[in-house]
């Protein structure tokens, strides 16, 4: 494994990401019509070259040939409407890849009209609606995109039944769009419906069901992370309801991961290395849950045990499992952290190549909690600052051998008092993977963080104390560098 991949594995288990954007469940080029034939050899060659160039991601060239093919087919009255519709659809897909949504929509609408002349329930309606929906999503026309996705789903129901496997792509898109629109309950419903489809197609205990269970587990983890853990009214007008919703959502995530584990254990046994990805995802979920962090230790201890006893696992993978466990111990205040880090240190001291990797991991401190920086929105510009002047705080601090922060000093800044308190609290509660030199944990001094703030209102406040942090916006930049 490369150093970057290993370091990525180390941090991934501790980070519960939050995504509020629509992620594409498929590439529009997946819906290209690839089996067309024409009486003209010129058109056959244009068609084949269009597909080949699209597959090679050469969309400019594919677009030129596609335009020529559209013109040729449109001028040939011997070609049936359905074939022309498919040629138009291919051209629309290429236009979409060229970031020409207006032209793509015009082409796809012409294609739909031709197909509807055959039947409004024709099978081709499904790919056309999927392509149109993805174009609309990129345009931000999300409500209309859902309408197209629903129509695509309806077509699959007519030909494959309510649990048609073909619809999973459409359902994924519907769920993602609803997440972006903050229709979370509807997004939840769509995610669970996709699980039912997979259960119906694959079987409730099929090993092939594991990827879907893991995907839904990750979805509900992301949902849970998006809700505040704190009960303070600053974050919510209904804190008790939010806490219950958060707990319920994390319970769903954990339940799906546990089910995936049970299926894998039945298929492979309890100590198979193929369980590791699911175990790490479950540990990440427990860490994000916060109230379940102690359980994450047990899960990652199991990962270490599986890897250490498996002859297939290599030394870097074993070291990664120990570092992930050590980081979890550090966050939880478990005294076993130091011993665990040193085991990883020793493993990575066996060859010069491993030693270089060891130094990249342990030669400097690494923030492991909180992974989300402090809020950086203030209500008004402080009265002592000018319009356009940067509002900031610069602080220095040290990281102790146990990964805790000490010697916090706000050395410079013009931000309000509330923000200074926030930065101090953020640093005080931070946990770091400590620096190790010659197998000894050492104090790291002279670290600096620089935090900027954005202003909601342009008018200056009468006093700098009147501002308050926003619970939703993250900082532009937080740098932590060691002084020379």
Language model features with spans:
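Mid-chain, structured segments of secreted extracytoplasmic proteins
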Residues: 74, 80-116
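Bacterial N-terminal signal peptides that target proteins for export
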Residues: 1-8
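Surface-exposed, polar helix/loop patches in the mature regions of secreted/periplasmic/lumenal proteins
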Residues: 101-143, 150, 156-157, 172
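Hydrophobic packing position at a conserved site in alpha-helical tandem repeat units
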Residues: 69, 73, 111, 115, ...
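Sec/Tat signal peptide C-region and signal peptidase I cleavage site
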Residues: 20-24
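Charge-biased low-complexity segments
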Residues: 25-48, 59, 63, 67, ...
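Bacterial N-terminal signal peptides
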Residues: 8-17
């Amino acid at each position: 494994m490369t150093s970057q991949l290993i370091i990525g594995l180390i941090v991934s288990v501790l980070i519960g990401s939050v995504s509020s954007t629509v992620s594409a469940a498929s590439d529009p080029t997946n819906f290209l019509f690839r089996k067309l034939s024409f009486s003209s050899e010129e058109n056959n060659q244009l068609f084949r070259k269009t597909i080949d160039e699209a597959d090679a991601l050469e969309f400019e060239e594919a677009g030129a040939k596609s335009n020529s093919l559209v013109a040729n087919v449109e001028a040939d009255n011997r070609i049936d409407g359905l074939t022309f519709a498919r040629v138009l659809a291919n051209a629309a897909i290429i236009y979409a890849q060229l970031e020409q949504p207006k032209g793509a929509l015009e082409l796809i609408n012409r294609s739909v009209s031709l197909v509807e002349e055959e039947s409004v329930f024709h099978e081709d309606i499904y790919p056309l609606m999927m392509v149109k929906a993805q174009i609309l999503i990129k345009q931000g026309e999300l409500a209309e995109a859902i309408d197209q996705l629903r129509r695509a789903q309806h077509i699959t129901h007519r030909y494959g039944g309510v649990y048609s496997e073909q619809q999973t792509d459409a359902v994924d898109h519907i769920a993602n769009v609803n997440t972006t629109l903050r229709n979370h309950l509807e997004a939840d419903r769509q995610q669970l419906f996709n699980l039912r489809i997979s259960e119906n197609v694959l079987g409730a205990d099929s090993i092939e069901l594991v990827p879907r269970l893991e995907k839904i587990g990750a979805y509900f983890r992301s949902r849970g992370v998006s809700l505040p853990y704190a009960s303070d009214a600053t974050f919510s007008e209904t804190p008790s309801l939010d806490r219950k919703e958060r707990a319920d959502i994390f319970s769903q995530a954990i339940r799906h991961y546990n089910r995936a584990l049970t299926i894998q254990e039945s298929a492979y046994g309890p100590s198979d290395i193929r369980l590791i990805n699911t175990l790490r995802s479950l540990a990440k979920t427990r860490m994000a849950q916060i109230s379940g962090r102690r359980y994450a230790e047990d899960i990652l201890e199991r990962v270490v045990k599986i890897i250490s006893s498996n002859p297939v696992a290599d030394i870097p993978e074993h070291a990664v499992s120990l570092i992930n466990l050590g980081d979890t111990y550090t966050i939880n205040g478990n005294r076993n952290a130091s011993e665990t880090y040193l085991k990883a240190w020793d493993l990575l001291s066996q060859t010069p190549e491993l030693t270089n990797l060891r130094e990249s991991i342990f030669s400097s401190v690494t923030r492991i909690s909180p992974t989300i920086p402090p809020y950086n929105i203030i209500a008004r510009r402080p009265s002592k600052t000018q319009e356009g002047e940067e509002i900031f705080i610069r602080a220095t601090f040290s990281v102790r051998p146990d990964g805790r922060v000490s010697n916090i000093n706000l050395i410079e800044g013009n931000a309000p008092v509330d923000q200074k308190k926030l930065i101090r609290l953020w640093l005080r509660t931070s946990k770091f993977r400590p620096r190790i030199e010659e197998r000894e944990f050492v104090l790291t001094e002279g670290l600096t963080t620089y935090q900027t703030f954005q202003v909601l209102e342009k008018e200056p406040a009468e006093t700098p104390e009147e501002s308050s942090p926003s619970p939703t916006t993250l900082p532009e930049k937080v740098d932590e560098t060691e002084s020379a």
